[in-house]
């Protein structure tokens, strides 16, 4: 439910506020395991950080339920980006074991020159946001999974002029050089 910041399908000057009611709350389900540190969960790390004073009922900031508000915010941002001529495509690639997946995201329409070198690089800002999503364990840009083991001469990148603009022949590095976008697909 949208509380403020949205009116007649448009954002307003008010802070963007929404609420998602969790109707699947059942703390009893967690009673038997409330004193067990579950692998793959934040049980132990939050126990240490907060001196044992943290949710033991599956809720709280470490819950997978925290993905829901990120999805809502992402939907609003996607619509804003579309109006700016920036389009996102995504594809889920499931692992054979069924225990995980990759999400491939391609971004088109980002102009060259976005980002900063070093700590505020385009990649570091995106990675920072991605790692805020529960269960994300890695972020790659470009074709790094296919290229890390190749010789540099096999992946040498060159610019060519297309339609009067410099364009990369291959775009191996995913549209970002030196932390700054180069106008290619990300």
What are these regions (language model features)?
Residues 1-186:
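Generic N-terminal targeting/processing segments that precede catalytic cores or assembly contacts
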């Amino acid at each position: 439910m949208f509380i403020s910041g949205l009116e007649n399908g448009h954002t307003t000057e008010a802070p963007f506020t929404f609420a998602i009611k969790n109707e699947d709350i059942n703390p009893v389900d967690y009673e038997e395991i409330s004193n067990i540190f579950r692998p793959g969960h934040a049980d132990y790390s939050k126990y240490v950080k907060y001196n044992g004073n943290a949710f033991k009922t599956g809720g709280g900031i470490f819950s997978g339920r925290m993905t829901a508000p990120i999805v809502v915010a992402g939907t609003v941002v996607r619509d804003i980006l579309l109006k700016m001529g920036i389009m996102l495509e995504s594809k889920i690639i499931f692992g054979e074991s069924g225990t995980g997946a990759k999400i491939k995201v391609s971004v088109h329409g980002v102009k060259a020159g976005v980002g900063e070198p070093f700590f505020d690089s385009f990649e570091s800002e995106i990675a920072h946001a991605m790692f805020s999503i529960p269960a994300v364990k890695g972020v790659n840009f470009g074709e790094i999974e296919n290229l890390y083991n190749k010789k540099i001469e096999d992946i040498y990148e060159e610019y060519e002029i297309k339609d009067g603009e410099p364009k990369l022949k291959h775009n191996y590095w995913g549209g970002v050089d030196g932390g700054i976008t180069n106008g290619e697909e990300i």
